[in-house]
Amino acid sequence: QSPYQIITNHPELDMSVRTLYSYLDKGILSARNIDLKRQVKFKPRKVHKTQIKDRSVFIRRMFSDFQALELDHFAEMDTVHSSQDSKRVILTFFLTREKLFLAFIMNRCTKGAVKLVFNKLEHQLGTYDFLTLFNTILTDRGSEFGDPESLENGINGIMRSSIYYCDPMRSGQKGGIEQAHTMLRMILPKKTSFEYLTQWDLRTIVDHINSTPRESLGGRTPYDVA
């Protein structure tokens, strides 16, 4: 747990987050700063993805185009890869208003697999609710996202979303989903095989992540806000 989560879940401590950090720095408490999620300085993430090669895909879908929209809320999208012994990946979404994290297992990291998830979600939610949640999506330049038109055009021919891309090597431009991945990797560390991971397993993990209080939500959880 982060210091913020500790203070939120244990009001009997009657101290601020700043005070808790101070106590940890001074060695008054047994935990060390190196044990804390936000104190650790992570190395830049290595990029293992195959990148989109067709540059025409990015016309009017650049990060600068996305910024010009000046949106209050949108969705972020990414994939999390298994260990090398499995081709399965997790397609993830982060809804920035609710801080809500969603995850779906895919058998392959392909454009077609991503489209199948989009179509399934639209079937389950209905076109109107899909449009409400995924009207604008910011993602990276992984090749699995290289056919934006197939993702933008819905099952009934109605435009269901608009896809935009981060600048190269700038994963921090979709920082919400990167933070959610940090929480996901606490449960599914790197080099974990997803070969036998089920959607039910993922639902349990996602429920845990979305039930964690957030400072940015005033101590509420994403489920409280959604």
Predicted regions and their residues:
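A short, amphipathic alpha-helix used for macromolecular contacts
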Residues: 1-12, 62
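Mobile genetic element proteins and their domesticated derivatives, centered on retroelements
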Residues: 6, 20, 78, 99, ...
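Basic, flexible linker segments flanking DNA-binding modules
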Residues: 15-67
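Short conserved beta-strand segments at catalytic cores or DNA/RNA-binding microdomains
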Residues: 67, 80-102, 107
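Active-site beta-loop-alpha junctions of metal-dependent nucleic acid enzymes
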Residues: 82-86, 103-128
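Acidic/histidine-rich, metal-coordinating catalytic segments
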Residues: 130-147, 167-169
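Charged alpha-helix within mobile-element recombinases
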Residues: 142, 160-226
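Short, surface-exposed basic-aromatic patches at helix termini and helix-loop junctions that form
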Residues: 149-161
